[in-house]
């Protein structure tokens, strides 16, 4: 069986968790391959009696909620161990079996000095800040690239861990004390903080690349879920307003240890409108009642930070870009229900940059900052669509919206989200 990647095709918060969880019933492994606890996803589960449970996850793969599925944290993830066990304990208290979790021995670990540096750097930058979550993600990835990072496997050898922490703090404390006027971090406190997790962590840790490739050899299905999204990818996003990891289909391979030839399907997740958290360009952003409507009805507040998300109309230009960068085979269009009640729904089909039409995303970020959306206006609908389960169940104008977005976005739409619950989905094509 193949490996399948689920990728955010906008600026994040597209509903990847719900899509992953829906597919998780048909797969054997769900893998988080990038990022850390800087992004969150909410999964809503309704049991046979109609009782609804909402789960907010930040670090764990959403497959943790699917019985019989093995959730995996891959080598491309940076792990805050305190957050990891907070999430595991919270799920265990609600009756979720968390013993299935597997974690790569090569994943990097967020230390307290990484969190401190993240926060003080953002404050130091002031108006030039990136808009990070302050959770130490960027500094931990920087340590990884600089070859001074702490990996999960290091926590099981106190001597090696101490040597590594001593080496990294020689550098970090120079920055903390002499540039930011902060207190120096100590080797003893840092080592103690990390060693405290060793016994609980040990049974979960393995060579996850080997684990996943052996699963594929046995004919099992592996689902790779991205944190963040294409437009936040460190290489292909709106740099420098990006995350510090690879959030594209290419990153799915490097962050999991699965070779590219085994990745047969790439599912791009797009909202029926667009949102963004933090700084950076956003051509279709709304600053009026329409934007407030999307934010209120769509409950657009960050799972991780609680920050209000910036809201705007659907941008087919960035969807086409994401389809090209990732090789998207299928789109899942989420939150179509949020558009219910609007008289007309604009869709951005191109940009005007200095009087010149751009049908593709400008490679020059200055041009992208100055891009003015060119809209096509589609008729809205008033009917409640939350009970729709087939395309024919949708009102004619909602069907027309889905078809128009599909034609503009560069890949077929195979499913449409029409509500927050797990089963509130219109199936158009089989995803597996």
UniProtKB/Swiss-Prot annotation:
Residues that bind substrate: 303-309
Molecular function in Gene Ontology: adenylosuccinate synthase activity; GTP binding; magnesium ion binding
Cofactor binding note: Binds 1 Mg(2+) ion per subunit.
Enzyme class, broadest EC rank: ligase
HAMAP family per UniProt: Adenylosucc_synth
Pfam families listed in its UniProt record: Adenylsucc_synt
Name of this protein: Adenylosuccinate synthetase
Assembly and oligomerization: Homodimer.
Compartments it resides in: Cytoplasm
Top-level taxonomic group: Bacteria
EC number: 6.3.4.4
GO CC terms of this entry: cytoplasm
Chemical reaction(s) catalysed: IMP + L-aspartate + GTP = N(6)-(1,2-dicarboxyethyl)-AMP + GDP + phosphate + 2 H(+)
PROSITE patterns xref list: ADENYLOSUCCIN_SYN_1 (PS01266), ADENYLOSUCCIN_SYN_2 (PS00513)
